Amino acid sequence: MFCRFSGCNLWNGREHGRKDAICRFCDTDFVGTDGDGGGVFASADILVDAVAATWQGASHPRAARFVVCTGGEPLLQLDAPLVEGLHAAGFEVAVETNGTRSTVPGLDWVCVSPKGGTDLAITSGNELKLVIPQDGVDPARFESLGFDRLWLQPMDGPDVEQNTALAVRYCLENPQWRLSIQTHKHIGIR
């Protein structure tokens, strides 16, 4: 399950701000939301209750309750009380972040998706997912960092076929990298 946070430190989320943004290729609507109350929660406990109520997983012993905190940039808002509350509700907690802010204690999985023109505050974790191509960004720059897995994801948009070919070729030539595709887009999950 995804828990999407609004706001980002690399782009304001509005088209008029894209040309001046550090990250100009974001494909996520993290400004507006169609959730109850506009997606605003008065406390960590209320958000935990909303996540738990949304969970549709069965009670099978192998059905892990897993929530990915994403954004925007989730580390602008994600804090220890929310992570603790999600754990208390039986969830494993992951974060997908641009890596420019420090993590919070207790996360079970850390995925960093670096953006060109930024410095990383997080240099180790479970996975690094690099969207390519990005101007001035060489995947080799990230190989010496402390991530368990390295993923290349083709940039979406009008050049997605060309970008996919680039990512596949790079992974074949550099097998320390794996290919990541946005499955939810290919099968129509919103």
Residue ranges and their predicted role:
Residues 10-107:
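Conserved Radical SAM active-site core
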